[in-house]
Amino acid sequence: MEAILNKNMKILIVDDFSTMRRIVKNLLRDLGFNNTQEADDGLTALPMLKKGDFDFVVTDWNMPGMQGIDLLKNIRADEELKHLPVLMITAEAKREQIIEAAQAGVNGYIVKPFTAATLKEKLDKIFERL
């Protein structure tokens, strides 16, 4: 059964590479999600999350300032944010990193490069479990 996804949910896309943010944004738009905002690293993203009633976070791992894994840990440690689903899209395919992300509470993990179908499948899986 496919999860019923709220197409109006507010999504924050966090990646230091603007092209990657645009790719993710376009794929989300193709899936019907138009309510997206962008941040270029965890240091920029965290204050946005604290005051922005976001419903979902898509983040890269390797970024200057604050890495995606640290952003995830900060989200999970914050009473207001800890419920937020987080999807990590990264080139980091090492088993240790996938385990570290899982232990930190990531909801989904996609290794680049990826397709729209992979993104949709992960979103469906994440929202089935919420």
UniProtKB/Swiss-Prot annotation:
Q: Which UniProt keywords apply?
A: Chemotaxis, Cytoplasm, Flagellar rotation, Magnesium, Metal-binding, Phosphoprotein, Two-component regulatory system
InterPro entries (UniProt xref): CheY-like_superfamily, Sig_transdc_resp-reg_receiver, ST_Response_Regulator
Name the coiled-coil region(s).
none
Annotated CDD domains: REC_CheY_CheY3 (cd19923)
Membrane-spanning residues where?
none
- Summary of the knockout phenotype: Defective in chemotaxis and reorientation in liquid medium.
Q: Which cofactor does it need?
A: Mg(2+)
Describe PTMs of this protein: Phosphorylated by CheA-2 and to a lesser extend by VieS.
Biological process terms from the Gene Ontology for this record are:
archaeal or bacterial-type flagellum-dependent cell motility; chemotaxis; phosphorelay signal transduction system
Under Gene Ontology molecular function, one entry of this record is: metal ion binding
Q: Where in the cell is it found?
A: Cytoplasm
Give the CC-aspect GO terms: cytoplasm
> Any idea which positions bind Mg(2+)?
15-16, 60, 62
Consequence when changing residue 100 to A: No impact on interaction with FliM
Residues carrying 4-aspartylphosphate: 60
First-listed, main subcellular location of the protein, grouped into a coarse class: cytoplasm
The subunit field of the Swiss-Prot or TrEMBL record says: Interacts with FliM.
Query: What the protein does?
Result: Acts as a response regulator to control chemotaxis. Involved in the transmission of sensory signals from the chemoreceptors to the flagellar motors. Switches the flagellar rotation by binding to the flagellar motor switch protein FliM. In its active (phosphorylated or acetylated) form, exhibits enhanced binding to a switch component, FliM, at the flagellar motor which induces a change from counterclockwise to clockwise flagellar rotation.
**NCBIfam families in the record:** PRK10610.1
Q: Indicate what this protein is called per its UniProt record.
A: Chemotaxis protein CheY-3
